[in-house]
Amino acid sequence: MHLLGHTLQFLSINPIGIGFGQHAGNLAIMQHGESAKCQAMYEVCWHIFFQGFHVRTHDFFNRQAQKLLVDNGFVVIPAQNPEFFIVYETNRYDGIPNFITTDAMLHNYHLFFNQLLKTVETQYLIPELKKLNTGMLAESQKQYESLKGTAWENAARRNVAFFAVGNRLLDPQAKIPEQVKEEVERELALIEAHQETAVSPVMTMGKSPDVLESLKEDYTQYIPRGHYVKSEELKNYFKTMMWYGRLTFRLKDQDEIRSAVLMTLALNRGENLKNWENIYRTTAFFVGKSDDLGYLDFQRILAEVYGNAVSLKQLATDSSQWELFMKKAAKLRPPAINSIPIFDETIQPDREREIKGFRFMG
């Protein structure tokens, strides 16, 4: 059994035999039945017969371990085996049978998967993400300049802040655009503190924060874990992907959906879509596709409503087409799993309305 990063060895002691299962790092001895609760366990050494195998085990119990064994039927104590195969090899020389449990196989698979993922992220995905950050931030700034003075200005400004946060998380030396500096710095402070659930400063841009209606984010999710603690580069990648994968532009908020539409258009520019697909398809292969709405969903509806060459001017001036887009978007699927902090059903009874929306990276 894999337990808190250690490997345990199990010996099952009963009146007729003993069974073995090895996990390096600790040795656990388990007993079953009243007859196993005997003071013979205190002896310097003892002998057990297991279907013809003769096993000699030296005393490795202190008084506390002896008491726990008698009281609970099992005890876990330190051993000198850092990996499974060492125990198996030792048992082979000593003539001790191995009881190999499925977790030993799964652990090996996990080690292989983890190393493969880390290699792909370090050598391939991080460089792609840097290019995507640069391209999306630049395109968002162009959109903002073009949409000033329109109903879409705030949505465009939010996108500048959104990608400025992602860019700064991946590259701590990256510059923050002046027009969004205050909101970005407050967002980054919440991410780096990673201590609470709070209203997102970036997602509430252009309106007063409302604890009920504003998008709330669980900032404790930004604590790097697993292989992501191995380097600063991986820590930064983890936080950036968490940011892009968690923030939801909800269908219930028209201004947030404007941001999602502008992101979709920005992805269609230059190399942005290629970089996005390289990241998304690779991560989807490893961990599965997103169940949230994303680029592919919005691009399909945009093409249905506006055609294949929608312009920013068309978005900002044609209200009838925008209304049609919103109606079609409302019919899209809800997410299968919710990760947005919301209140219980007595306060927010329409769960789908609260969580349904667009995510940049799913």
What are these regions (language model features)?
Residues 6-13, 24-25, 36-39, 50:
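Compositionally biased, low-complexity intrinsically disordered regions
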Residues 14-19, 30:
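Residues marking helix boundaries in flexible regions
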